[in-house]
Structure formats: structure tokens, C-alpha cells
């Protein structure tokens, strides 16, 4: 099994990604695509690194990224049975009550050609959660989550079917498996969110990255305000734990006219609507 990501100036998140997936798969089975970082975050990495040429590209950034990753994935199937691609802030965590890790989880799913995790956004509530203590697991310090249908992305595959639409779709049928979570850390820390959202807004304006209808064009003020509205609660300890049984997964994956399947549902409206939950206790030591 090999895991890939693409990173641009991710000094905060890239070390977390390498530490987690390196612990799951071994750093020799990680591939980082460096999208023109200038913050030294990709210097002296312990895993395979490819430095990408800068813009202008032949096509837009999203199509360039997708073509690169799909091409690499097809080649990697010469050496691996499973290829995974995640954004640098996305962490695939099988249920610790049932699995020792990703490898153990996949051993029991050899017949599933494409797997999508159940997506949760990890949210920071600064009213009750202080700054991170690096000596403690991150998830033990960031307990709040919301179900995000759009984050149920088909990221694990055993076949060279091409990913589509920013990796929310793929040219093969797939199902969402609640036994593995995708924990999305974009909103895990207010200070980090401000920095990341400013960086992404600048890239959206200069290189047209990200959809105009996504969070990319929104700056730190708008996204911080939305995050605080999502976690607003008189007492965080009264929030129940997330239970996959409370969400309907049957209508999220839909076939599209061009012969691929994708998850349905914009992320920001889902965050406004879906109830706030706590990450179950058994996940708190995952990373």
C-alpha cells in the first residue's frame, strides 16, 4: 500500500501527514508531490519527494493535479496492491475497536475495489479547547466534529480507475464504509485556519485554484466566523459522541452522466446544518 499527497507550503500539516501515514505504512511507502513550496517544509523529507514545475501549466491547476496523481497512481500499481491519495490535512483512521491500522483494515476488504471513508470535519472550539500541547495526541485536544458528506471521498483504490472532480469522484462504483473515518483537519485550529485560508485565497486569486463556490475564495475572517458558529454551544461536555448510525449514507454516492461516481453535497452548507458531535473516545489516541 502506498499513500500520496500534494503539499504547498504546509509546514504545519505535512509533518503530521508523514508521521501518521509513515507510522501506518512506513515512510518508504509515502510519496509527496511538492507544489512549489518556499517555506522549507519539503526539505530533507524521509520519504519519496517529487518537486513539480511551477505555473503556467497546459491546463488549470485542478486538472493538472488530477492528471499528475492519476498518472502516478497507474504507475504505482506495478508495485502496490492499494493506492491512496489524500490532501495533506486528511487522515484515514479505521475504527480502533476493530482494526490495528490501515493495513489490517484493508486485509479484510480485498474484494472491494474502491473504498470511501466516512468524512468528519474536526473543529476547534477555542472557548473550551486551548492551544495544542505537542506532547499530547492532537485528537485528544480537538474533540468536536461534524459529518461532512462531501468528505466521503473515494480515496482508497485497488484498481487504476481515474479520480475525478477534486478526488470527490472516480470512474468506478464505490460505497462509503463507516468502519474507516476521514478526519479532515482544515478547521482543527483557529490560528492555523487563518493562515491556511489566507494562503489559499491568494492562490485562488493568482492561479484560479479551487472552485469559486468552495471555501478557497473565502478569507480568514469569513471562515473563522463560520467555524465559531459551527461550534457554538453553552457547554461542550453536553455534546453527544458521533455515531455513524445517525447519518444516512445511501444517497451520498451518485452516478454521473460522464461515466463516473461522486459524492454529493456542498461542504459549507452541510457544516451549517449538521449537528455538532464529539469524536468517540476510542479514536482519541489515533494521532
Where are these regions (language model features)?
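Active-site-proximal specificity loops/subdomain of glycosyltransferases
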Residues: 38-85, 94
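Active-site beta-to-alpha loop of glycosyltransferases that engages the nucleotide-sugar donor
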Residues: 5-16, 36
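Catalytic-site signature of metal-activated, phosphate-bearing donor transferases
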Residues: 62-67, 96-287
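Short, hydrophobic beta-strand segments that form beta-sheet elements in well-ordered domains
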Residues: 29-34
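Active-site neighborhood of glycoside hydrolase catalytic domains
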Residues: 77-78, 85-88, 99-103
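Cell-envelope/extracellular polymer assembly enzymes that use nucleotide-activated donors
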Residues: 1-2
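Short, high-confidence coil segments that cap the C-terminus of an alpha-helix
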Residues: 27, 80, 110-114
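Short, acidic, metal-binding catalytic loop of nucleotide-sugar glycosyltransferases
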Residues: 19-28
Amino acid at each position: 500500500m502506498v499513500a500520496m499527497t500534494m503539499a504547498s507550503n504546509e509546514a504545519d500539516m505535512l509533518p503530521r501527514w508523514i508521521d501518521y501515514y509513515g507510522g501506518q505504512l512506513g515512510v518508504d511507502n509515502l510519496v509527496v508531490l511538492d507544489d512549489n513550496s518556499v517555506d522549507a517544509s519539503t526539505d530533507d523529507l524521509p520519504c519519496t519527494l517529487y518537486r513539480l514545475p511551477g505555473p503556467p501549466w497546459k491546463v488549470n491547476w485542478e486538472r493538472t493535479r488530477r492528471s499528475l496523481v492519476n498518472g502516478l497512481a497507474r504507475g504505482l500499481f506495478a508495485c502496490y496492491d492499494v493506492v491512496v491519495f489524500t490532501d495533506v490535512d486528511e487522515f484515514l483512521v479505521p475504527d480502533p475497536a476493530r482494526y490495528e491500522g490501515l493495513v489490517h483494515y484493508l486485509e479484510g476488504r480485498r474484494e472491494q475495489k474502491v473504498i470511501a471513508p466516512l468524512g468528519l470535519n474536526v473543529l476547534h472550539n477555542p472557548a473550551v479547547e486551548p492551544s495544542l500541547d505537542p506532547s499530547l495526541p492532537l485528537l485528544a485536544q480537538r474533540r468536536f466534529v461534524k459529518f461532512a458528506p462531501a468528505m466521503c471521498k473515494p480515496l482508497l483504490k485497488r484498481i487504476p480507475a481515474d479520480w475525478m472532480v477534486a478526488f470527490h469522484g472516480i470512474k468506478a462504483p464505490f460505497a462509503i464504509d463507516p468502519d474507516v473515518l476521514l478526519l479532515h483537519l482544515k478547521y482543527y485550529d483557529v490560528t492555523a485556519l487563518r493562515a491556511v485560508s489566507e494562503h489559499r485565497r491568494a492562490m485562488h486569486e493568482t492561479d484560479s485554484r479551487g472552485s469559486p463556490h468552495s471555501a478557497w475564495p473565502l478569507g480568514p475572517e469569513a471562515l473563522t466566523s463560520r467555524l465559531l458558529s459551527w461550534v457554538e454551544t453553552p457547554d461542550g461536555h453536553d455534546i453527544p459522541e458521533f455515531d455513524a448510525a445517525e447519518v444516512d449514507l445511501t444517497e451520498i454516492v451518485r452516478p454521473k452522466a460522464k461515466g463516473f461516481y461522486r459524492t454529493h453535497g456542498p461542504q459549507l452548507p452541510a457544516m451549517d446544518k449538521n449537528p455538532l458531535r464529539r469524536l468517540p473516545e476510542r479514536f482519541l489516541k489515533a494521532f
